[in-house]
Amino acid sequence: MAKPLPRIGSRKNRHMGSRKNVRRIPKGVIHVQASFNNTIVTVTDVRGRVISWSSAGTCGFKGTKRGTPFAAQTAAGNAIRTVVDQGMQRAEVMIKGPGLGRDAALRAIRRSGILLSFIRDVTPMPHNGCRPPKKRRV
């Protein structure tokens, strides 16, 4: 007869569940990607391994509200709260994209208490590469 599988939420195997590896990170990199439709904030260590991330969509904003500055501020606050608890004190900020959430996300990062070593704009700019799509007629 087959053995019954243990329940996932049972009291016996509560230490067996996967638990996120909590490690002390003194310095990290905060990547902010602000498009017109959404803002994604990713916190990595200096080697580029993702520690925490958040976006306006995961914070509960839907549709056109995801592109607002308030949604970007909320997403940045959510992503940074976890790394501040892990002990991050210094960070570099890389901002990419033309969206409305750029400044709001940066304001939320400044308010978090992390010392910023530098803020860099890494928006990709073509040196007259591909032809852009035709202009919208509304």
From Swiss-Prot:
GO terms for biological process: translation. It is found in: Plastid, Chloroplast. The keyword rRNA-binding applies. SUPFAM superfamilies: Translational machinery components. Keywords: Chloroplast, Plastid, Ribonucleoprotein, Ribosomal protein, RNA-binding, rRNA-binding. It comes from the Eukaryota. Part of the 30S ribosomal subunit. This is Small ribosomal subunit protein uS11c. It comes from Morus indica (Mulberry). The gene is rps11.
